[in-house]
């Protein structure tokens, strides 16, 4: 696990949780809600990032929150700094491409959500998760909220933290694999990325369970991520 000295951002491997907190509470408070969202389910390369954010009710409200997809990169960075400064607790989990290929992207997202929630379980007592599924094995009750990243402020904050964390990592991966231009498309399936994939083949960051990557490998059957057989991970991945 690494921590940036300038902004306290945390990057973690798939097997770990990450947490930053200034919590004054010794035990969880059922009135405090963790917003949970992911970034990077669809790309052909890189991890899926899941964040959980619990706002500090004693700190000022953050203005300008929105779904991260509706914000410019510059605005996301600005809001990210405010979120991690004013949050009571926040966590970010990255599930890497190898784990995604092993258990599939859906299960990897469920795993990331559970680990992200566990990272703030010492202060929160309820989770509100963007989407229509709640992973099993959470430490406290939760609900799924379709379109939550446009409706709930804590989910909006989680979407921003997840997106900024992942985008920063993809820029770092660009330095290792400049031929793919991860800094521009962040691993998504753009024409330029597909062309680079055909020219250079996949790198270790590519998700081999995704059809375009499989085609670049010359496999006859290009299975999509959800067609690939799943292996269990911690036994707690299936959604309720």
From Swiss-Prot:
<protein>
    <recommendedName>
        <fullName>Ribonuclease HII</fullName>
        <ecNumber>3.1.26.4</ecNumber>
    </recommendedName>
</protein>
<feature type="binding site">
    <location>
        <position position="130"/>
    </location>
    <ligand>
        <name>a divalent metal cation</name>
    </ligand>
</feature>
<keyword id="KW-0255">Endonuclease</keyword>
<dbReference type="GO" id="GO:0006298">
    <property type="term" value="P:mismatch repair"/>
</dbReference>
<keyword id="KW-0479">Metal-binding</keyword>
<feature type="domain" description="RNase H type-2">
    <location>
        <begin position="31"/>
        <end position="222"/>
    </location>
</feature>
<feature type="binding site">
    <location>
        <position position="38"/>
    </location>
    <ligand>
        <name>a divalent metal cation</name>
    </ligand>
</feature>
<dbReference type="Pfam" id="PF01351">
    <property type="entry name" value="RNase_HII"/>
</dbReference>
<keyword id="KW-0540">Nuclease</keyword>
<dbReference type="GO" id="GO:0043137">
    <property type="term" value="P:DNA replication, removal of RNA primer"/>
</dbReference>
<dbReference type="InterPro" id="IPR012337">
    <property type="entry name" value="RNaseH-like_sf"/>
</dbReference>
<dbReference type="GO" id="GO:0004523">
    <property type="term" value="F:RNA-DNA hybrid ribonuclease activity"/>
</dbReference>
<feature type="binding site">
    <location>
        <position position="37"/>
    </location>
    <ligand>
        <name>a divalent metal cation</name>
    </ligand>
</feature>
<dbReference type="GO" id="GO:0032299">
    <property type="term" value="C:ribonuclease H2 complex"/>
</dbReference>
<keyword id="KW-0378">Hydrolase</keyword>
<dbReference type="InterPro" id="IPR024567">
    <property type="entry name" value="RNase_HII/HIII_dom"/>
</dbReference>
<comment type="function">
    <text>Endonuclease that specifically degrades the RNA of RNA-DNA hybrids.</text>
</comment>
<keyword id="KW-0464">Manganese</keyword>
<keyword id="KW-0963">Cytoplasm</keyword>
<dbReference type="InterPro" id="IPR022898">
    <property type="entry name" value="RNase_HII"/>
</dbReference>
<dbReference type="GO" id="GO:0005737">
    <property type="term" value="C:cytoplasm"/>
</dbReference>
<dbReference type="InterPro" id="IPR001352">
    <property type="entry name" value="RNase_HII/HIII"/>
</dbReference>
<comment type="similarity">
    <text>Belongs to the RNase HII family.</text>
</comment>
<dbReference type="GO" id="GO:0003723">
    <property type="term" value="F:RNA binding"/>
</dbReference>
<dbReference type="GO" id="GO:0030145">
    <property type="term" value="F:manganese ion binding"/>
</dbReference>
<dbReference type="InterPro" id="IPR036397">
    <property type="entry name" value="RNaseH_sf"/>
</dbReference>
